[in-house]
């Protein structure tokens, strides 16, 4: 690494227009990772770069890419139609768009009259197809492609696209690209490229990819690792707050309303949680329970691409105090300069994501703070777990919660206005349990020790759902009667949807279900009656059969006796009276036998 971080100390001369761009964009000096990476990658070295979030990794590969395009004469007409020079792969559309923005910012300083350097963004969207992308590529002939794995792979498979001129491949957030979600697509893309290309892997946690890096086809790579005792940048304070689950929303509102910040990102565990809590915060704002100067935005992975990009742009350009509720779709690489506060309602499933979340604040040596909420109990072991990964977090015990009076009642009253909100609350709760069960640190985040009632109260639930987790891990004594968390229970039959069409459909479905139930009941009764009649018939038939069998048996015995009897004419008919008299006489004679001499 160069002893000085001045741009003038690079051991080769930057293109004059790039040097002008660097000064104009406010990069007064290089960061350590830029000073180490730019000379290596610009001079035909494969690199594996690991550095803390916000350390300038994007510029560290954009400058060498632009330098290489010029060095390889790819900015001339020698680059054939259908060919390209560099491919940059990113795990998310937002990050790909941001990289494209950095490249375009540099290219605004490219001298007029030169053969233009161009880049093209390739991400899935609802407004353009792969064929549209191919048509634009063939028309504008860009040298640099920036995109997400799925769309890039579809693009490269098109017959008009040729990969033989590709001289460089960049994997930004490489550890994410090499995990099971993207691994297959990324490997396929890299196999389609020339083996002699240069490859660069960049991430704050690239070491977590392990042996996967060898699947990228690098040749004698140089590892650039900016060593620090703490993986977080020095300008970023990472804190945690231990709290009862039921008080988490009150804590969030206290920080949003009272903490000094310009822009804040709130990370929630699931997409459905983002929409749910965004609606709650909007409702509280209407009731003047939120800072009146606060603007709320929401972003998650299930939104259409255009909607996501517009939301991110509006949040970035917002001049006042603003909060973005989001999922991990905005955890990696997103660089919004004014973010100085990051709040995590729950730790992420993967500990590596924790650092990426925190790194949205404190970028480019600007002061920032990241706070994670931990449930009381076993979750407190998460802090020593982070220390093993060189992430230091300090407890923030100076925050005094300023509770909004009657908040649980406000949320429940809001839910009771519309059955759809009731359904939504149950789905959010169930989704959270699924999320919690997938934590990689399963010895810390255990369903057996979760405060199910407290979590339900934080979500504003009116009734506990009958999930397997609750049935398995919550004692029967702890489960309220029929799961109701309010008293008295509400009448679900009369609980209506605010949307007339949806309510009409519910009533129709209810009537159809009742008709089916009544019909099934009638069928059951008829079946029972039919079974009773048939059983009687069978019993009667069985008796008749037994009688017939007995009669036949008796007849057979009588016939056999007749056959065995003596029918001769000499047979003497016996008089039963004579037999009786003879027996009596015999008895008398037997009593008088003997001689007087025997006495």
Swiss-Prot record:
Q: Does the keyword Lyase apply?
A: no
Which Pfam families does its entry note? Answer: CTE_SPB4, CTT_SPB4, DEAD, Helicase_C
Q: Which residues cross the membrane?
A: none
Q: Which GO terms describe its molecular function?
A: ATP binding; ATP hydrolysis activity; RNA binding; RNA helicase activity
Q: Where is this motif: DEAD box?
A: 172-175
Q: Domain of life, per the record?
A: Eukaryota
Q: Does the keyword rRNA processing apply?
A: yes
- Where along this sequence does the record place binding of ATP? 51-58
Q: Which keywords belong to this entry?
A: ATP-binding, Coiled coil, Helicase, Hydrolase, Nucleotide-binding, Nucleus, Ribosome biogenesis, RNA-binding, rRNA processing
Q: Where is the Helicase ATP-binding domain?
A: 38-224
Gene Ontology cellular-component terms listed = nucleolus
State any GO BP term from the record: rRNA processing
Q: What is the role of the protein in this entry?
A: ATP-binding RNA helicase involved in the biogenesis of 60S ribosomal subunits. Binds 90S pre-ribosomal particles and dissociates from pre-60S ribosomal particles after processing of 27SB pre-rRNA. Required for the normal formation of 18S rRNA through the processing of pre-rRNAs at sites A0, A1 and A2, and the normal formation of 25S and 5.8S rRNAs through the processing of pre-rRNAs at sites C1 and C2.
> To which protein family does this belong?
Belongs to the DEAD box helicase family. DDX55/SPB4 subfamily.
Quaternary structure and partners: Component of pre-60S ribosomal complexes.
Q: Which PANTHER family match?
A: RNA HELICASE
| Protein name per UniProt | ATP-dependent rRNA helicase SPB4
Please name the source species. Eremothecium gossypii (strain ATCC 10895 / CBS 109.51 / FGSC 9923 / NRRL Y-1056) (Yeast)
């Amino acid at each position: 690494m160069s002893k000085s971080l001045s741009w003038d100390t690079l051991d080769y001369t930057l293109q004059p227009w790039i040097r002008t761009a660097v000064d104009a964009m406010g990069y007064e000096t290089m960061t350590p990772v830029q000073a180490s990476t730019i000379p290596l990658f610009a001079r035909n070295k494969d690199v594996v770069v690991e550095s803390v979030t916000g350390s300038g990794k994007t510029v560290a590969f954009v400058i060498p890419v632009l330098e290489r395009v010029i060095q390889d004469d790819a900015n001339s007409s020698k680059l054939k139609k259908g060919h390209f020079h560099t491919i940059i792969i990113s795990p998310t559309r937002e990050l790909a768009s941001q990289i494209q923005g950095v490249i375009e910012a540099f290219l605004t300083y490219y001298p007029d009259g030169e053969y233009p350097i161009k880049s093209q963004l390739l991400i899935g969207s609802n407004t353009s197809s792969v064929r549209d992308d191919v048509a634009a590529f063939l028309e504008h002939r860009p040298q640099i492609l920036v995109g997400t794995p799925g769309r890039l792979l579809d693009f490269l498979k098109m017959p008009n696209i040729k990969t033989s001129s590709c001289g460089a491949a960049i994997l930004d957030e490489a550890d994410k690209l090499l995990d099971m979600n993207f691994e297959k697509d990324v490997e396929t893309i890299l196999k389609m490229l020339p083996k002699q290309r240069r490859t660069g892997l960049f991430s704050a946690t690239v070491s977590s990819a392990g042996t996967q890096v060898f699947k990228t086809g690098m040749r004698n790579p140089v590892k650039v690792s900016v060593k620090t005792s703490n993986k977080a940048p020095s300008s970023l304070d990472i804190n945690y707050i231990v709290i009862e689950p039921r008080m988490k929303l009150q804590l969030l509102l206290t920080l949003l309303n009272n903490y000094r910040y310009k822009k804040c990102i709130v990370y929630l565990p699931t997409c459905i949680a983002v929409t749910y809590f965004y609606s709650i915060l909007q409702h509280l704002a209407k009731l003047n329970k939120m800072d009146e100067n606060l603007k709320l935005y929401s972003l998650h992975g299930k939104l259409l691409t255009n909607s996501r990009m517009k939301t991110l742009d509006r949040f970035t350009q917002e001049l006042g105090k603003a909060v973005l509720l989001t999922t991990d779709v905005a955890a990696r690489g997103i660089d919004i300069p004014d973010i100085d506060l990051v709040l995590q309602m729950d730790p992420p499933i993967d500990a590596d994501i924790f650092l990426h979340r925190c790194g949205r604040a404190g970028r480019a040596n600007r002061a920032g703070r990241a706070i994670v909420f931990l449930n009381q109990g076993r979750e407190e072991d998460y802090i020593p777990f982070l220390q093993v990964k060189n992430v230091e977090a300090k407890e923030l015990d100076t925050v005094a919660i300023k509770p909004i009076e009657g908040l649980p009642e406000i949320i429940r009253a809001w839910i009771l206005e519309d059955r759809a909100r009731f359904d939504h609350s149950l789905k959010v709760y169930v989704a959270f349990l699924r999320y919690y069960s997938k934590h990689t640190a399963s010895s810390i985040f255990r369903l057996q020790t979760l405060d199910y009632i407290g979590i339900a109260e934080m979500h504003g639930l009116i009734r506990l759902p009958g999930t397997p987790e609750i049935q398995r891990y919550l004692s029967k004594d702890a489960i309220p009667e029929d799961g109701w968390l309010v008293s008295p229970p509400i009448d679900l039959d009369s609980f209506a949807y605010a949307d007339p069409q949806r309510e009409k459909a519910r009533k129709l479905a209810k009537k159809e279900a009742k008709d089916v139930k009544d019909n099934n009941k009638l069928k059951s009764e008829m079946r029972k009656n039919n079974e009773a009649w048939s059983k009687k018939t069978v019993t009667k038939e069985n008796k008749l059969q037994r009688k017939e069998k007995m009669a036949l048996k008796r007849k057979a015995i009588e016939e056999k006796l007749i056959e065995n009897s003596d029918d001769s004419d000499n047979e003497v008919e016996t008089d039963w009276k004579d037999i009786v008299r003879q027996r009596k006489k015999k008895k008398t004679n037997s009593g008088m036998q003997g001689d007087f001499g025997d006495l």
